[in-house]
From Swiss-Prot:
Residues 1-24, 77-84 are virion surface. Coiled coil: none annotated. The gene is M. This is Membrane protein. Disulfide bonds: none annotated. Pfam families: CoV_M. InterPro entries: M_CoV (IPR002574), M_HCoV-like (IPR044362). Belongs to the betacoronaviruses M protein family. The chain crosses the membrane at residues 25-45, 56-76, 85-105.
Length: 230
């Protein structure tokens, strides 16, 4: 005798159960969304590097979570229309995830900085201070960059980089590394304010797929490729 396979029961979520779920988890979901909103709203490198790193982690997790959800939708599609859209969304998400990694690796090869994997931007400003390369992300490749020294503290575009520097330590050039090319900024103006403070303005002077010679004698490395990044 042939056995008859009993179909698996189909569970449906009623409106009352959905309302009960929201009532039970509403407070926790509200706290989580409030936390994420605060991080995304106030996560800037010029304000708090710690908060900015948390923001980057949240943004970085968005793509794998999106891919997981789209795959889940493919497995448990309601009908063929939903299945088709889910497959398209999954392919798009995976392609964009791969493109992100490819661009990040290319930028990492150019700069040697882990900031290359920043999901927010592919622009990394680089400044060589007495042989030490500082690399930080910026949203845009501005026409001018401002470097400020306040009582020995070094700031670039408002982002604190280090201490123990003077105006005489500022280089003639700074760069902004992108995935496909390098932007060079030449120092166009320098003004001293007091004995230990001042600022310099760097103006975009050259754009191309090239590298600058290192300021470290005998190092054989390029300015945008120094490995002692901070």
């Amino acid at each position: 005798m042939s056995s008859v396979t009993t179909p698996a029961p189909v569970y449906t979520w009623t409106a009352d159960e959905a309302i009960k779920f929201l009532k039970e988890w509403n407070f926790s979901l509200g706290i989580i969304l409030l936390f994420i909103t605060i991080i995304l709203q106030f996560g800037y490198t010029s304000r708090s590097m710690f908060v900015y790193v948390i923001k980057m982690i949240i943004l970085w997790l968005m793509w794998p979570l999106t891919i997981i959800l789209t795959i889940f939708n493919c497995v448990y599609a309601l009908n063929n229309v939903y299945l088709g859209f889910s497959i398209v969304f999954t392919i798009v998400a995976i392609i964009m995830w791969i493109v992100y990694f490819v661009n990040s690796i290319r930028l990492f090869i150019r700069t040697g900085s882990w900031w290359s994997f920043n999901p927010e931007t592919n622009n990394l400003m680089c400044i060589d201070m007495k042989g030490r390369m500082y690399v930080r992300p910026i949203i845009e490749d501005y026409h001018t960059l401002t470097v400020t020294i306040i009582r020995g503290h070094l700031y670039m575009q408002g982002i604190k980089l280090g201490t123990g520097y003077s105006l005489s330590d500022l280089p003639a050039y700074v760069t902004v590394a992108k995935v496909s090319h390098l932007l060079t900024y030449k120092r166009g103006f320098l003004d001293k304010i007091g004995d230990t403070s001042g600022f310099a303005v760097y103006v975009k002077s050259k754009v191309g797929n090239y590298r600058l010679p290192s300021t470290q004698k005998g190092s054989g490395m390029d300015t945008a490729l120094l490995r002692n990044n901070i």
